[in-house]
């Protein structure tokens, strides 16, 4: 029997340190709810889960971008609804003026309303804005010379974007006024013949507006479908990231209980090992 080196005590002390570290790790995982709290816990798992987290954040922002896009489209469509109503009213007045029972003076009075409505079409086009940007003056037309585009980033990665094109919806672009801005240059209802020609012009204008509204509806449907897909992708990534990173509480509690018992046993065995040297004393008496 030796007394200078108590190997049993040293072994018990080393195991006590190991078990105590295990308990501390269990407590950290149980209190944080995460299996990986630092790179040392699982280096590869941390790298993969961090990539997933960045992707999830990107998808969540893409969802917001899509919501902004839908709001932009709905605002534009609302202005075009007003334009459609005005064009419908002008067409109604043109049909009225084409009727032979009205005098030239009557048609002049009708023309006054038509001219005011044409001015309103221009007012809507110039005042239709979203976040300070004009929407109906051709800034975002496919053939725009301004060089501006309306682009929405609808994904979490590079080049995952979609463009929205909005044509010019001014009175001149719709054929309601001439190149000099004279409301009577192209749309006059001063006679039954000119009123009849105005009906054809208005039909063409309504076709342009309705096509633009249909395009906006298609854009919105696409965005809404993209939002659903992004939502599903985000959910799946969060589920996968949870499997990698989150704590399995039931399993961790079992491990925590085991390590607590081992720690208590190590403390007891360390106490026993420290008393072994006292067995030498009877030999010396």
Swiss-Prot record:
It comes from the Bacteria. It is found in: Periplasmic flagellum; Periplasm. Keywords: Bacterial flagellum, Glycoprotein, Periplasm. InterPro entries: Flagellin, Flagellin_C, Flagellin_C_sub2, Flagellin_N. GO terms for cellular component: periplasmic flagellum. Pfam families: Flagellin_C (PF00700), Flagellin_N (PF00669). Signal peptide: none annotated. GO terms for molecular function: structural molecule activity. The core of the flagellum consists of several antigenically related polypeptides. Belongs to the bacterial flagellin family. Component of the core of the flagella. This is Flagellar filament 30.7 kDa core protein. It comes from Treponema maltophilum. The gene is flaB3.
């Amino acid at each position: 029997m030796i007394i200078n080196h108590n190997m049993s005590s040293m072994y018990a002390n080393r195991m006590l340190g190991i078990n105590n570290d295990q308990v501390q790790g269990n407590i950290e995982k149980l209190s944080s709810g995460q299996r990986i709290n630092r790179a040392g816990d699982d280096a590869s798992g941390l790298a993969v889960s961090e990539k997933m987290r960045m992707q999830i954040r990107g998808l969540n922002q893409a969802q917001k971008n899509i919501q902004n896009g839908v709001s932009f489209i709905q605002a534009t469509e609302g202005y075009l609804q007003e334009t459609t109503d005005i064009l419908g009213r002008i067409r109604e007045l043109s049909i009225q003026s084409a009727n032979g029972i009205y005098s030239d003076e009557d048609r002049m009075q009708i023309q006054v309303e038509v001219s005011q409505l044409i001015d309103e079409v221009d007012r809507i086009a110039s005042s239709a804005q979203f976040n300070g940007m004009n929407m109906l003056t051709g800034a975002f037309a496919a053939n725009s010379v301004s060089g501006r585009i309306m682009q929405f980033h609808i994904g979490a990665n590079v080049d995952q974007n979609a463009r929205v094109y909005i044509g010019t919806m001014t009175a001149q672009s719709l054929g309601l006024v001439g190149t000099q801005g004279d409301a009577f240059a192209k749309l006059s209802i001063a006679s039954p013949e000119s009123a009849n020609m105005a009906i054809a012009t208005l039909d063409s204008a309504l076709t342009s507006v309705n096509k633009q509204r249909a395009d906006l509806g298609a854009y919105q449907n696409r965005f809404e479908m993209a939002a659903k897909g992004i939502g599903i992708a985000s959910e799946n990534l969060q589920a996968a990231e949870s499997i990698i990173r989150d704590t399995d509480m039931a399993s961790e509690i079992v491990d925590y209980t085991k390590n607590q018992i081992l720690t208590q046993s190590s403390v007891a065995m360390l106490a026993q090992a420290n008393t072994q040297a006292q067995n030498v004393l009877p030999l010396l008496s």
